[in-house]
A protein has these predicted regions:
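Lectin-like carbohydrate-binding module/patch detector with strong preference for beta-trefoil
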Residues: 1-163
Length: 163
């Protein structure tokens, strides 16, 4: 199947953990997500903890596998996207499904790259080279953000995400 840019290929149910083994949890009331101390026994379905990672085929050569993320909370589906707010790129979650086909550029696509093992990755935002999903402390939890790295090969533990 050929398309202009990205065609949905498959998806996997996953849990996303940061370098501190904290679990990514999406909060629909604030349209964002953060990493929290959650054990495997505390994980519940449809509570913003169990993500789907959608793989896309692309006609353009890319630095890594194009992926998008979605999550279900209380029988509603949300997808991860990036938007500019007050001159800064932020990670948001919007109600809806990830599209099957995406023509052209998209604010939901990230390039999955190996970090340093087969289970640890970093995810580069497709619309801005050098911008990666990361986390930063905010109050009692670590908020999911986009972070600019000065060099592509820079090792930054805040961008490491374990699947």
């Amino acid at each position: 199947l050929e398309c202009d840019a990205f065609c949905h290929e498959k998806f996997f149910h996953i849990y996303l953990r940061n370098a501190n083994s904290q679990l990514l949890v999406m909060r629909p009331d604030s349209d964002d997500a953060g990493f929290e101390n959650v054990t495997d026994h505390e994980i519940k379905k449809d509570t913003g903890m169990n993500f789907d990672m959608h793989y896309y085929k692309t006609t353009k050569p890319s630095e890594g596998m194009p992926v998008a993320f979605s999550v279900k909370v209380d029988d509603k589906n949300y997808y991860m996207c990036c938007e500019e707010e007050s001159g800064k790129m932020i990670v948001r979650f919007k109600e809806g499904q990830v599209p099957k086909d995406i023509s052209g550029d998209s604010n939901i696509i990230f390039f999955k790259r190996e970090f340093n093992s087969t289970k640890e990755f970093k995810f580069e935002y497709s619309l801005e080279q050098g911008m990666f999903l990361a986390f930063e402390p905010e109050g009692i939890y670590r908020k999911l953000i986009l972070k600019k790295l000065s060099r592509e090969d820079e090792v930054d533990e805040t961008t490491k995400i374990r699947i």
